[in-house]
Amino acid sequence: MRYTSTRDKNVGVTSAWAIAQGISADGGLFVPVEIPKLSLEDIAAMADMSYVERAKRVLALYLTDFTPEELAYCVEGAYGDNKFSSEDIAPIHELRAGEEILELWRGPTCAFKDMALQMLPRLMTVSVRKTVGTRETVILVATSGDTGKAALEGFKDVEGTKILVFYPDEGVSPMQKLQMTTQEGGNVSVCAIKGNFDDAQT
């Protein structure tokens, strides 16, 4: 599958290139040239799959330049090893008849951002390896809350990556500060800055 830029439809890159670059050189976002179509039978077949199996199936439609082994590394690394407090990863909980909620807080930091940030580092390392070789990827993050801890936890000890999170010293809760400053991992760092979130971004 090819990806194009929201600012220039003549751009055409692989999914690995889009992930490794983050944004297009023209400042646009990468989007799929076309959205894969699933039949009702395809959707029904996924209903009984585990979250991990379903994720591999859906990602294979969008990341066509990834091998099954690479997809397994990304998905199983993100959602395996009891990282989530439910084996369903994102279970649906019935409140009462006809009312259900999707629980997106079952990840290691109890933030919905765990859903993406547990997989992103693995997608990035595979994508960088496929496009530019074995370079180390350094991620700089600015946060005013949950993103920092979720990003640190996601990138923790993922080979080929380092992450540095900036946060406003007076702009996060005491709990969030403790979560970030006590983060384990050999490739993670945090830095408090004087100022607000906008200052952290610059």
Task: Show which residues each predicted segment covers.
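PLP-dependent amino-acid enzyme catalytic core
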Residues: 1-202
